[in-house]
């Protein structure tokens, strides 16, 4: 692109529409000086800015560029070689703030209690209620007594990093005990689906509450933790007003030990566990090709974990700890499975581009992933896909 010719074309188009540089800058959300630099040939607008101006002026991008010739002065239509629309794409890195705090509809932090518990026995990002005993089992003997955590890895997981599969245990000797999380954003009038994998040493009624920053109760309902194995209990809570510093609290007054394997809180209007407003913006971008799960994170990912129910999938501790620490405290919570990713691509009109994990997955396991995605229901993993609600590849 010849910046001088482009600048002259931009100025001509602007003057034809009786726009000042300030007015054009306001329409493009750029300073007036930027418009002047373009017109003097000192700088070049981005393609998105050219596209915006072409719509504004009612012309083509080629008209604004002021030069219809290609390299070496050849006409632009001289080369009839078709270029694949999949030559360029975007990357959905399943780590850091891209999913957790990004496209994921989950609003709770550390919802599977990873890492070492804090000083008072509560997992990081959670606070304890009352002077009771909060702890997370940390030895084989404790797990023998209290049972294994709810979260787990699927077959073929070889990394075995630290404190990925934890649970939060609360022992109450009388009175009220529980745990909570603060600094949550609630939308006014929005319904939130709360789900928890729980069990208890004696049948225990848990009170689940949404609270405002001033301590007022927006909504409160109960679920029951039963003895025996974990069960997922669910209810819907509604926030009566917008609050940027809301709280979720889980409390009980039974003399018992309650074991919480995972918790979830997300708006009921999500799409496969993802935010609809973010997906709408992705549609606007016109993404043609979307890569997932990484990037660097491809070397962390065990695809078969995604075959487990979402709340049961073990978090993944990242070897790129310094990259993930500011976002998710060094862990990823595996919110998106292969099925979810493909559904997202179909929703936004993008071609899915899946990256394998040659570091920890064998060639056979990678081939099984290809089989899961592309083969019919007459194969082992084709049947698994069909059982998950997707009979067609």
For the regions a language model picked out, list residue spans one by one:
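A short, Lys/Arg-rich alpha-helix, primarily the initiator
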Residues: 1-16
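Alpha-helical residues within the helix-turn-helix
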Residues: 15, 26, 55
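Short alpha-helical DNA-recognition segment
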Residues: 18-37
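DNA major-groove recognition helix of helix-turn-helix/homeodomain DNA-binding modules
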Residues: 48-63
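Extracellular and organelle-lumenal recognition/adhesion modules and their flexible linkers in secreted
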Residues: 60, 71-334, 351, 361, ...
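Catalytic-domain carbohydrate-binding cleft regions of carbohydrate-active enzymes
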Residues: 90, 334-335, 341, 348, ...
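Active-site groove signature of glycoside hydrolases
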Residues: 252-253, 293-294, 379-393
